[in-house]
Amino acid sequence: MPQMAPIGWLSLFIIFSLTFILFSMMNYYSTIPQSPKSQILKKSQTNSMNWKW
């Protein structure tokens, strides 16, 4: 079975590292965070329930 040269392992490691970083960045930036204003409005709307006992 042939052995790989150290530069082959290094290039393989660099390729896998770059693809991992690329997919991680794509996953991070694919979601669009909601603005804080909409979250504050949602909280105020849910907390303003008037219970009539």
Curated annotation (Swiss-Prot):
Keywords recorded for this protein, A-Z: ATP synthesis, CF(0), Hydrogen ion transport, Ion transport, Membrane, Mitochondrion, Transmembrane, Transmembrane helix, Transport
One Pfam family it belongs to: ATP-synt_8
Superkingdom classification of source: Eukaryota
Transmembrane segments: 6-26
Topological relation to the membrane, as annotated: Single-pass membrane protein
GO BP: any one term: proton motive force-driven ATP synthesis
GO MF assignments: proton transmembrane transporter activity
Phylogenetic lineage: Eukaryota, Metazoa, Ecdysozoa, Arthropoda, Hexapoda
Assembly notes: F-type ATPases have 2 components, CF(1) - the catalytic core - and CF(0) - the membrane proton channel.
Protein task: Mitochondrial membrane ATP synthase (F(1)F(0) ATP synthase or Complex V) produces ATP from ADP in the presence of a proton gradient across the membrane which is generated by electron transport complexes of the respiratory chain. F-type ATPases consist of two structural domains, F(1) - containing the extramembraneous catalytic core and F(0) - containing the membrane proton channel, linked together by a central stalk and a peripheral stalk. During catalysis, ATP synthesis in the catalytic domain of F(1) is coupled via a rotary mechanism of the central stalk subunits to proton translocation.
Subcellular localization: Mitochondrion membrane
Family: Belongs to the ATPase protein 8 family.
S-S pairs: none
Name the UniProt record assigns to this protein: ATP synthase protein 8
Keyword field contains Ribosomal protein: no
GO CC terms of this entry: mitochondrial membrane; proton-transporting ATP synthase complex
